[in-house]
Amino acid sequence: MSKINEIIEAVKGLTVLELAELVKAFEEEFGVSAAAPVAMAAMPVAAAAAAPAEEQTEFDVILKAAGDKKVNVIKVVREITGLGLKEAKDLVDGAPKPVKEKVSKEEAESIKKKLEESGATVEVK
């Protein structure tokens, strides 16, 4: 039997705990890490998988159209943004335009609900 076959036979007879100790001994003896090559190979896959998993935290509320009740929409836009009458009217007339940007999901949904109740068409991005 060759030396390699003897080593393989010896490794086959080891328990999991003994194998873990063997790996640790190899790492210390030769100054290498058994985990590094595996982690480096897996990292691009993990990074690609993690990107879509990130949840969006900031949302923009976009007024798509004012609808039939433009006056009501202007009132709600003024209430939400704190704009003056002319600025709110210009925003509504210039639709599609952002009403609020970089707000939380809850706030975006609340604004969307208010605007839709007033007759507007709204999108949250």
UniProtKB/Swiss-Prot annotation:
InterPro entries: Ribosomal_bL12, Ribosomal_bL12_C, Ribosomal_bL12_C/ClpS-like, Ribosomal_bL12_oligo, Ribosomal_bL12_oligo_N_sf. The keyword Isomerase does not apply. One of its GO terms (cellular component) is cytosolic large ribosomal subunit. One of its GO terms (biological process) is translation. Keywords: Ribonucleoprotein, Ribosomal protein. The keyword Membrane does not apply. GO terms for molecular function: mRNA binding; structural constituent of ribosome. CDD domains: Ribosomal_L7_L12 (cd00387). Pfam families: Ribosomal_L12, Ribosomal_L12_N. Homodimer. Part of the ribosomal stalk of the 50S ribosomal subunit. Forms a multimeric L10(L12)X complex, where L10 forms an elongated spine to which 2 to 4 L12 dimers bind in a sequential fashion. Binds GTP-bound translation factors. Forms part of the ribosomal stalk which helps the ribosome interact with GTP-bound translation factors. Is thus essential for accurate translation. Belongs to the bacterial ribosomal protein bL12 family. This is Large ribosomal subunit protein bL12. The gene is rplL.
